[in-house]
């Protein structure tokens, strides 16, 4: 395992890449409504990213099980946990939830963040899933502090979600991030406090709870990218890129503009 600590200048560049991801998600928030296809959202995202001098890192991302990822964002609707491929057939419906995962490469550094959106008015059951998953993200971030361990992040996420009866997907994890989208270490969403790598200041990691309304079991669709819940129940996914600091983590990505556009939905 090779973990790269970042300089302050490098963290500054990562902050810029991640802020662009936040702005891209906000731009998409303006267009998420019933009748819109996920392919339309992908085209909006790619144009926005490129217009701001960056490259969408997901496009062409290699897959050990099949071909490279064909789009600029992942659009995961309802029972899709992650890696949903934008297409013209998936039309958003009133009451859907959609997780949009977005990555950028700007000035040699990567940004990565995900947000689960409501399409129109959604059920209270789905709102509670989203609320809990987002809370779990911030529980994890509270533990991304120098001197603690990766297991402290993982345990905080797991305990918060499982206490409310939700499933934590175990096959998928967060990750280190920097020049590359996926660097060491992996950041699981389950674990034991005090276990795992000790966190050091200037480590940069993506923390991303992937939480299911039902059981945690998943399956890989025939496109070799789309991962769904095995029981067909909805899933939510929130992600921030953070810099480990002494005392308190620094969140490099941002949901601020998204939440201003969305208002208080849940």
Regions found by a protein language model. Name each.
Residues 1-266:
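Active-site neighborhoods and metal-handling regions in enzymes and metal-associated proteins
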């Amino acid at each position: 395992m090779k973990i790269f600590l970042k300089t302050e200048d490098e963290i500054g560049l990562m902050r810029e890449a991640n802020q662009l991801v936040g702005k891209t998600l906000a731009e998409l928030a303006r267009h998420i409504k019933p009748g819109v296809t996920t392919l339309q959202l992908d085209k909006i995202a790619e144009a926005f990213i490129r217009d701001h001098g960056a490259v969408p890192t997901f496009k062409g991302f290699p897959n050990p099980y099949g071909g490279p990822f064909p789009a600029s964002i992942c659009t995961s609707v309802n029972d899709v946990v992650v890696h949903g491929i934008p297409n013209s057939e998936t039309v958003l419906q009133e009451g859907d939830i959609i997780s949009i995962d977005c990555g950028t490469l700007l000035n040699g550094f990567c940004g990565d963040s995900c947000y689960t959106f409501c399409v129109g008015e959604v059920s209270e059951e789905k709102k509670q899933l989203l609320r809990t998953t987002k809370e779990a993200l911030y529980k994890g971030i509270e533990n991304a502090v120098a001197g603690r361990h990766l297991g402290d992040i993982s345990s905080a996420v797991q305990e918060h979600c499982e206490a409310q009866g939700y499933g934590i997907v175990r096959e998928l994890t967060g990750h280190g991030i920097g020049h590359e989208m996926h660097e060491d270490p992996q950041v699981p969403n389950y674990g034991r406090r005090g276990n795992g790598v000790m966190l050091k200041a200037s480590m940069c990691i993506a923390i991303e709870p992937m939480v299911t309304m039902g059981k945690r079991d998943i399956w890989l669709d025939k496109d070799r990218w789309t991962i769904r819940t095995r029981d067909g129940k909805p899933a939510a996914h929130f992600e921030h890129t953070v810099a480990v600091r002494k005392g308190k983590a620094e969140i490099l990505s941002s949901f601020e503009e998204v939440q201003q556009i969305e208002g208080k939905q849940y």
